[in-house]
Amino acid sequence: KWHEQNNIISTRDRTYFLQRDFFDSLSMLGHLPKGALLDIGTGAGIPGILLSFFRPDEHITLLDRRDNPIRFLEHVKLILKLENIEIVKTDINKMIMTKSPAAVIFKNFSNKVVSKLSFEAKLAYIVNMVRNNLGATSKIFLLTGSNALALQDNTSKHCDSLNGKIVITKIETPYFDTNRYILEIT
């Protein structure tokens, strides 16, 4: 019902959703540090809601600035009785946090500024946005495609420009020929 009216999830194909979005999200579990998580641009709550089932004792904030995803997330939280998630409707540039989360998560993050940027420029934009708004202590995790490979040849150059360390981990998936990656920036 929600998808038909609001296009909350990127696909109508349930199998594709399970094989890609669900699998990608669960692949992050072994990489994320213990502690509070912030899912920026969460949309349908992917990966934040999915991770909340496997980390019931950890606080997960789902951030989105759009009304439809927020209403959907509030409905899901109520129906599934998820006590460990907090839903915040705001833009990351306007968010005020008293304590930096252990990790910040992005999946398919996009806005009018970012959509026109190269992958490297998008990455720099995201890192600067997080560092400026949340402080330098949070690790940043991005679920991405093969565009992450462009960073491998020049990782030291990118690390210097981002003022941090980049770790690229391939997600081993039995479902697709294309590759997915977890980018960790510390």
Model regions and ranges:
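Conserved SAM-binding motif I beta-strand of class I
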Residues: H59-D64
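Active-site phosphate/pyrophosphate- and oxyanion-stabilizing loops and adjacent acidic/basic residues
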Residues: L26, I49, N128
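A generic alpha-to-beta junction signature in SAM-dependent methyltransferases
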Residues: L32, F54, N132-A136
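Surface-exposed loop/turn positions
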Residues: G35-A36, E58, S138
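Class I SAM-dependent transferase core
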Residues: K1-L38, N68-I85
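S-adenosylmethionine
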Residues: R65-T186
